[in-house]
């Protein structure tokens, strides 16, 4: 229950900037998203 709330709170707090540790995890998430995007692009090329 607390874990679920923390995830939502983190996301809500991220834009708020209340916690200094929030931007750190956000950056990590962005890196993962970017990595996924690159993989998709590569996959598209392979599919072609």
UniProtKB/Swiss-Prot annotation:
Induction info: Expressed only in the forespore compartment of sporulating cells.
Pfam families with a match to the protein in the record: SspP (PF08179)
Cell wall biogenesis/degradation listed as a keyword: no
Location of region: Disordered: 1-48
Keyword DNA repair included in the entry's annotation: no
Keywords: Sporulation
Biological process terms in GO annotation: asexual sporulation; sporulation resulting in formation of a cellular spore
InterPro entries membership: SASP_SspP
NCBIfam families found in the cross-reference section: PRK09399.1
Family, per entry: Belongs to the SspP family.
The protein, known as: Small, acid-soluble spore protein P
Organism encoding this protein: Geobacillus sp. (strain WCH70)
Recorded name of the encoding gene: sspP
């Amino acid at each position: 229950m607390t874990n679920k709330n923390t995830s939502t709170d983190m996301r809500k707090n991220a834009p708020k900037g209340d916690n200094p540790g929030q931007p750190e995890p956000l950056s990590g998430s962005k890196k993962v998203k970017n990595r996924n995007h690159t993989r998709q692009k590569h996959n598209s090329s392979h599919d072609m």
